[in-house]
Amino acid sequence: MNRYLVFLLFLCCLISSCRNRSQIKTSSDLEAETMIPIKDSSYLFNGVSLDGWEITNFGPQGPVSVSGGQIVLGMGDGCTGVTYKKEFPELDYKVSLEAKKVAGNDFFCGMTFPVGKESCSLIVGGWGGTTVGLSTINRKDASENQTTTYMLFERGRWYRIELLVRKDTVRAYIDDKLVVDYIRAKGDVLSIRPEVVLSKPFGITSWYTTAALRDIRLEKLD
C-alpha cells in the first residue's frame, strides 16, 4: 500500500511539472508575440528589429529602441530618428504608418521623403504640437506655406498617417482625413531643413519628443 501511495504522489508531481513547463514562455515565444504580422514585402519594419534601418546619427538624439512591435524614438536635444537604408522609390508611391506622441510638445512624426530628385518632409504636430504641413516649399517651412494646417494630437493615441507622392502632387491623410493636398506650381522648389539631411532618402524623426512608430508600409502607385 505504501509503495502504491508513493507511486501516486510521484505521478502527480510529474504531471504538475509537465504542466508548469508547458506554461513557461521561452525568449522565442515572447519575441513571436511582439512581432507584428508581416503579410507581404510592403512592410518596411518587421516589428522586432531595425533590420533595413539605422539610427540616424544627429548627435544630440535620444535613445532608439524596438519594443512591443514598435520603434520608440526617445526624447533628445533636437531630432531623434531612423533612416531606411534599402532601395526606395523616388515617385509614385504610398507610405503608411501609425505614430503616437508619448511625451513632449513638438512633432512626433517628421517623415522625410523623395519627390523625384528633390526631398521634402511631412511634419505632424510641429511648432508647439499642432502644426501639420510640408517643409519646405520655396524655402518656407510647414508653418508658413500653403500646406499649413492645424490639428490637436493626444498623447498616447495612435494616428494613422498616409503619404502619397507623385510627380506633381503630394497628399497626406491622418486617420483618413486629407490634411495636405499640394499641387506643384511652375517654379516650385521642394527641399528639407538642414537638421534632417541625414534622413535622406527616407527617414522618420521626432523633435524634442518621445514618439512610437509601427505598421510602416511602402506601396507602389499605378
Spans of features found by a protein language model:
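Carbohydrate-interacting regions of secretory-pathway proteins
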Residues: 18-222
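Bacterial N-terminal signal peptides
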Residues: 7-14
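Positively charged n-region of N-terminal signal peptides that target proteins for export
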Residues: 1-4
